[in-house]
Every structure is written in structure tokens, then in C-alpha cells.
């Protein structure tokens, strides 16, 4: 599936790992039913791949992966994570899945302290596991874990070994988020050069706040698949955010994605509700303040033409525009908010209301529309339409 996405294509696959890497974050433990509910929403959203889980990790993961495959497998590619060994691969096969994500680390620090293996042994594992999965008819995506801290020559050798064994896709994980966009671009360009037209994917963590930027840099270097999570949830500082990556690819670079962007906000809120992880107030695209305005100059501009202070419309991502009241407010925004409540004031009355609002705000009080309405009623000299 997805092989039509060539290196020279303007199409980019969205590989969602909310249900696998996202759920690995401490404190996030989803039931099978909750995972299925999110999977349905992701399929509805239009992601190309759903990483349903790690079937060999637990019976619950096995059952969830199987159930997700049954529920949405006819709409979207469902993939399961597996270590590079036959036992894990067999367990994944037992779910009925047709796609597998095989990984083994390649960095010296992982080889020495975690795997206790030599580079030669790792290369053998890569070949054997990928070949075994291919011999069982699976679509195989291979990831060299901790790729960005791996000696580059050895990384390229590991990638080439996976391709020789039959891997369909190569995913490059920035496992601990140590890349910056310029360096990651160069690395992905080198990986693309040895992949023989196979799809290259990127998987970026956000330890330095660069997961989205690095993901975009990877695509600019030739990657045609991006691993993401809804709201950027995941281990430590999280993963590349689905909503940020999708909108940056589409609006800033002109790439094609299958995502129904008007469903981004509702998907974000569903994941937040089920995981118990709140969406940051200032979160790009789906945050409550992503399209919020208070400053008088900004509000005036947005009222006249939203593009003056918004790069995209909130409707495009299913979000909402919010005009706030406070010490930075201006008369145009106040007038619009009051008229939406059926209150029509002249300029003198509006200025009196605005002065009262600013006094309250400067004293640390929160001013909402109801408060503004009360003030307006007190100072109004006209009939109020309510």
C-alpha cells in the first residue's frame, strides 16, 4: 500500500503513531475500546497509516491491534510494531495484520549498553528479521532506532541491508530529538540516495522543540512519509504534531496530504479527552488561542479581513476565532462583540464601556462578554435589542 508515493511526488503519507508511540507517554493508558475509538477518528481524518500498537508487548496490545485492524483495516493501512526477532514478528502476524514496523537500534550507545551486540550482529539481525517478515508476505517498514546518533556510514549500511532484505520503506527516527533542520535535511538526503526509490519516512521527537521543523526538513530532503501523533503526545517532550506537520506541508510547502483538515480540531479534542492530556492553550492549529485576538489593532484588522492577522482560517482546521476583551482591546472589537449580543451603542458609550473594561483588566480581573454586556447596559442611553 502507498507505493504510488515516489520520491519526486508532491504527495506525503501521514503515518499516525498516536496509539503506539503516543500511548507510551507516562500516564497514558488507553483501553481497547478507547484505542478503537481513536482509530476510527484517525481513519475518518484521512491518515494513510495507523500504527495500532506493539502486539508482542502485552495481551492487551495484541487484542487492541487485532480489533483496530478489524474496525478500520478496510479504510487505512494498519501496522504493528515489532522488534527484530522472529517471536515478535510471529506475534504480529497472528493479529492478521499485513504491515509490520520492524526496528533495531544502530547507535553505538544502544549497541553497547542495551543490545550488547556488535555492528555485524545488528546487520545480521536486520537482514534476518526483514527477510523473515517479507517471506511471510508482509509489507515491511524498517527503523534503525537512534538513527541520528548512529555513525553515518554504518547507518547507511544498515539501511542498505534492510533494502537488500526486501524492506518496502525505511524510517529514520530522531529517537531523542537531537537533530536540527539543517543537519536532518542533509542526513535524509544521504539516506534517500541509497534507498533505491523506496519510500523514506521520518520520525522526530520534540526534546528541543524541533520535531515539526525537522519533519518538514526531512520531507524537503526527499522523505515522503512522516510519523506524527495527535497533539504531539509521546514520550518525554512528545513527537511531531500531526496537525502542525499537515498544515505546514500543505500551506507552506504545497505538498498534498490526504487529511481532511477541517476535522483536525475535533480529532485533537477526542484524543485529549480520552488520554486525559490537555491541549496547550497556545498550541498551534488546535489550541484555544490559536485564533484568539485581543489587541485593538489586531481585532480591527481581523474584522476587516481575517488574513491581516491569521495565516489560515480557523474553519479550515475546525477551530474557532475568539475575540477577547482586556486592557489591549479596542473599540472595533468591543463593538462587534456587543452587537453580536444585540447591544448597539454610539461611539461615546462604547468608549465609556471600553474604559471600564480596561480598568478591570488592569486590576487583574477577567473580562468576558457577560461582564462587558453588564457594563454596556449600565451606560447605554439607547434601547438595547436582546
UniProtKB/Swiss-Prot annotation:
Taxonomic path: Archaea, Thermoproteota, Thermoprotei, Sulfolobales, Sulfolobaceae
What is the required cofactor set for this protein? a divalent metal cation
Source organism superkingdom: Archaea
EC numbers, comma separated: 2.3.3.13
Q: GO terms for molecular function, please?
A: 2-isopropylmalate synthase activity; metal ion binding
Name this polypeptide is given: 2-isopropylmalate synthase
Which GO biological process categories is it annotated with?
Answer: L-leucine biosynthetic process
Q: Which reaction does it catalyse?
A: 3-methyl-2-oxobutanoate + acetyl-CoA + H2O = (2S)-2-isopropylmalate + CoA + H(+)
